[in-house]
Amino acid sequence: MSVLIDTNVMLDIALKREPFFQNSALALAKARAAGDTLLCATSITTLHYFMHKKLGEAGARRFITDCLQAMTLAPVKRSSIQLALGSDMHDFEDGVIAHCAAECGAHIIITRDTVDYAKSPITALTPTEYLNTQ
């Protein structure tokens, strides 16, 4: 099963944000064990920005390198952006991520922001909901 990990879940893990860290980390581990884990290309710059503030440039680059080695990067295509522009999703960034996930064949998006993914072409689950699936 292919699962896309949303930016906010990756930040919860990277920054060890409580009370979200544990379930986010467990959900990522479960997704990796179950198949392909995807990270949208748009997430990379956001992750770098926050990790740079915490770890400095070398640490941020090391973190991004680790992400690229552990996960498949979902490219942002023109079609993903066009679909997001025409979608009923209220948050454009989430729309781009959702359509990238769909175009890459993801089955699930793991996010803490399931409300903004209500009209996503891919089912969105919180880390806790994902942990409770078979």
Where are the predicted features?
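Acidic active-site catalytic centers that drive phospho-/nucleotidyl reactions
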Residues: 6, 94, 113
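Short beta-strands and strand-loop turn motifs
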Residues: 8, 42, 78-79, 110-112
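PIN-domain endoribonuclease scaffold, especially VapC-family toxins
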Residues: 23-91, 95, 99
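Residue-level signal for well-ordered alpha-helical positions
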Residues: 16-17, 50, 87, 120-123
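Acidic, PIN/NYN-like endoribonuclease modules and their adjacent C-terminal/linker elements
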Residues: 2, 26, 70, 99-134
